[in-house]
Amino acid sequence: MTRWALRTATTSYQVRLAPDGAWAELAYWGPAVEETLVPGPLEYAGPTPYSTAADVAACEYAPFGVRHFAQLDLIAEREGGVRGTLWRHSGDDLADKDGTTELRLRFADASQRLTATLCYRVSRDHDVVERWAEITNEADTPLRLERSRSAAFTMPTPGGARLHYLHGRWAQEFQTGQVELRHGRFTLENRLGVTGLAHSPWLAVQPLDEPDGPTWSTALAWSGSWAIDADADSAEGVTRVSLGRLPVEAAIELAPGETFTSPPACGLYSPDGLAGAARAWHAYQRGLRRDVTLPVVYNSWFATEFRVRADEQIQLARKAAAIGVETFVVDDGWFVGRDDDRGGLGDWEPDPAKFPGGFDRFVAQVRELGLGFGLWVEPEGVSPRSRLYAEHPDWVYQVPGRPMTTIRNQYVLNLGRADAAAWAHAALDRLLSRYDISYLKWDMNRPMTERGAGADLDGRHVANYYAILEALRRDHPGVVVEGCAAGGGRADLATVARCDVLWPSDNTGPLDRLVVQHGFLQAFAPHLMSSWVTDDPGFFATSPRSRDFRYVTAMAGVLGIGADISAWDQERLDEAARWISLYRSVRDVVQLGEVHRHGDPRGPFYAVEYARDDTVVLLSWRTGHARGSATHVSRPPRVRPRGVDPAARYRRRDDDSRHSGAALAAAGLAPLPDDTTDASVVILDRV
């Protein structure tokens, strides 16, 4: 039986061909092995009564016609023709270059005139297996793809599976959830046209009886509508996860000779539970990042909202520079017609009434303070009262003759149109070329409705979103791009590959934010997690917490300040300067270090540890009860750092004490020594 063995940094992924060449199946996925004929846990004896071999095999990609009853990844049909596909293996290629291996398995259906290529890519730099499918219409008539997933991954789960997922809503993103699945299907779907707030395109699978052991995790690199199905069969001892796009408006139709390329579905294995899977995702995402320093940002939204005035913004910028902020960002409200959320979107020109001395002069004043300068934009948003809509009403999504839905008082630009996409790119390129801008925050504040007619509307919109981001990064490499969608509504691996940092949630209340960040770090690396210190009391601040608590929470990723610092006295400004200086001294460790989470933020104590090179940073919080003050206990909580070297010695910066790594790992330390402290930063340097 033909078999291909793929190696990642620490794992093996082995694929073999069915005896008749009708499908590829997973033979082994786990810790790295040298053998290519591993008797893996996915072996099967053959079909059971009332099934076929394909329906019980660990099929890597199953079309209807090869499979009949079990989970499917492809459903293709021609008008007036046969619905289904019966293909055979027609060739393969295996290439290895610079530590990256790519496998391409080709299948062909001569009767339906369809070819498919199952694609795999792995690297010795990380443990992620990237997979995608290419479906080509070889006939002279259209081919409809009712379902066209990216890939499927099969995991051994004797006795059933424990599925971990991320769910939420606006201001409550990245909540962790789990479900036990012994039989049947668990589905996550998103039909919004953007990645979504309700669920993340991410899933982790564990055997029910091994919660801290072998863990498989999958994620979809797609920023539109998507679906993930997990089918478990405890009798068979397997769980199969199928991921891919979800064509909401209509099936995807391929013209003669056209090829559909699915977005990548990514999977990884870790022997170390959810924590190990999180670290594996972080390592992969660090490989996607550009070599840029993510600045400490001040964003003026909470200080002024839509009431943007140049003189007030400069006063904020002066104070921001004095406390050590590195980039000043003007959020919503800087452009013409934008005095509230009912106008202006689409007219991306500075409002001369708000910048009477000229926008060039305003930007220069900010830069003269030693600050970078940034702007908020929402390129896909169109206000009904905007000049853009008046001139191009056909550029927004709509169904002729039907009412148009406004959400947040705005429409959505049909980015799938070549002319609209070219206009959006030109508008952004003009801003970045004309003004000395080093930071761009790309927001998207509503889902898609009334998309109308047309081929693959979701695919065309997302493809042009990617193309614009790629062009901006190519032509303006010095600009840091932050991704945002009403908070964390566009957090996915495809956006991660094209943005430098993400905004996880509009909720900056410290207790809520800790929960959001805890879930975010399960799927995404800390260098992607923008987090601000905002005023208390604030809109989301429902429980009393110290200012230290807020700073330590924001230090857990990419620190920013979003408070109205014009109202701060000198004591508060000096306090902010100390925290920012401390963060900048350990920024590389926090953003790029190996992460270990201790406890759960919904409990009385929580800590996050970052280890890189010779430094360990431990952030700790006495979270207390959800609606009350910190819990009073007689013994302070202790943390045993996991990132220390037992053979080394460490100096604790705050008190200059020395400890062996072995003692720290065994006995731990007390980062919050008394009830008067609800948050702390402990830094350990190897000596």
Write out the residue ranges for each language-model feature.
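Short Pro-Gly-centered flexible turn/kink motifs
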Residues: 84, 252-270, 679-684
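C-terminal beta-sandwich/jelly-roll accessory domains of carbohydrate-active enzymes
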Residues: 414, 624-687
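Carbohydrate-binding surface patches
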Residues: 10, 600-646
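Glycine-rich, aromatic-flanked loop segments that form ligand/cofactor-binding clefts
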Residues: 53-55, 63-86, 207, 211-226, ...
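Conserved, mostly hydrophobic/aromatic
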Residues: 10, 133, 257, 298, ...
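Aromatic-lined carbohydrate-binding/catalytic grooves of carbohydrate-active enzymes
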Residues: 293-426, 439
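Polysaccharide-binding surfaces and accessory modules of carbohydrate-active proteins
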Residues: 1-5, 9, 13, 24-231, ...
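Active-site neighborhood of glycoside hydrolase catalytic domains
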Residues: 356-358, 390-392, 396-548, 558, ...
